[in-house]
Design a protein with these regions (language model features):
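Flexible "arm" and connector segments at domain edges
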Residues: 1-58, 64-204, 208-277
Length: 277
């Protein structure tokens, strides 16, 4: 069975200027980013579908992205893969003092037990200290500085909101957020009445942001929830297509009422299957 060292050697061979792969040789940090995002989503997709037969391969594809960036950095004399492993190991030891109180990875497993809330508070404190260390002027730091701009918009909205909530800038419970969602929807309707396309886009953005806030207060991950909604829509629409294929009727010839009826049938069948399960 091949090892991590073999994968690193393979990556080095692929990037060999004389004998490597032309495609791999010309890649850069920036050109690989879309592939990295795609591989991460394929891992998430395999997990959500319960496709563990393919999960191992998808995790390998994602690991290869880390190896690729590390190879590029090694070629430029920045860091190596071993440094990546060392960095994350040190960070996790530092962030888990309740597990590694002495900072020794191999210390005896006899440590004081902390509550989940104590662990969470310590985790946030340590991350705040790490953010401060990244700046020469800690007093100018923003709590939002290290929220990646490249995150999917729903996830980034949730992270921005969570970060602000750490200093009390947050709704006290979910119910006021529901009212805020209604307010934002009303503002969308007002913009629609004025036929102001720029205002409509702005207000729809506010509505989405408020919906993410509601999800956060309900302890629902917005990206996961939306992926579930996407999967549900796809499943039901495929049901409509298959039902029409069975009757040899083009979907383009159907009225909206007929399509809605098939959509309702798809929902009923899902509900029946759920109750039987």
């Amino acid at each position: 069975m091949y090892s991590l060292d073999d994968l690193l050697h393979l990556m080095n061979r692929l990037r060999d200027p004389q004998y490597g792969c032309p495609w791999d040789i010309k890649q850069t940090y920036t050109s690989i980013v879309p592939h990295t995002l795609e591989e991460a989503y394929e891992v998430a997709d395999a997990i959500e579908r319960g496709d563990f037969d393919h999960l191992q391969g998808e995790l390998g594809d994602l690991l290869f992205q880390v190896v690729y960036y590390s190879q590029l950095a090694r070629e430029e004399g920045r860091f190596e893969f071993a440094g990546v492993i060392d960095s994350i190991t040190r960070k996790l030891i530092r962030r888990h003092p309740h597990v590694f109180p002495t900072g020794d990875l191999y210390a005896p497993l006899d440590v004081p037990q902390l509550s989940e809330e104590q662990v969470k508070q310590r985790w946030e404190q340590i991350k705040a200290e790490e953010r401060a260390e990244k700046s020469d002027a800690p007093e100018q730091l923003s709590l939002l500085d290290d929220v990646p701009t490249a995150l999917p918009s729903l996830s980034r909205a949730a992270k921005l909101q969570k970060r602000a909530s750490q200093v009390g800038f947050d709704w006290p419970s979910a119910l006021p957020v529901v009212d805020n969602v209604r307010e934002e929807l009303d503002e969308v309707l007002e913009a629609m009445a004025e036929n102001d396309s720029a205002a409509i886009a702005d207000e729809v953005g506010d509505l989405l942001f408020a919906a993410v806030n509601l999800a956060r207060h309900l302890k629902v991950d917005p990206e996961t929830a939306l992926r579930g909604a996407n999967a549900k829509f796809e499943r039901r629409f495929r049901f409509i297509e298959q039902a029409l294929r069975d009757t040899r009727r083009p979907i383009e010839d159907c009225t909206l009422e007929e399509l809605d009826a098939l959509w309702g049938e798809a929902k009923r069948q899902e509900k029946n299957m759920s109750s039987c399960g």
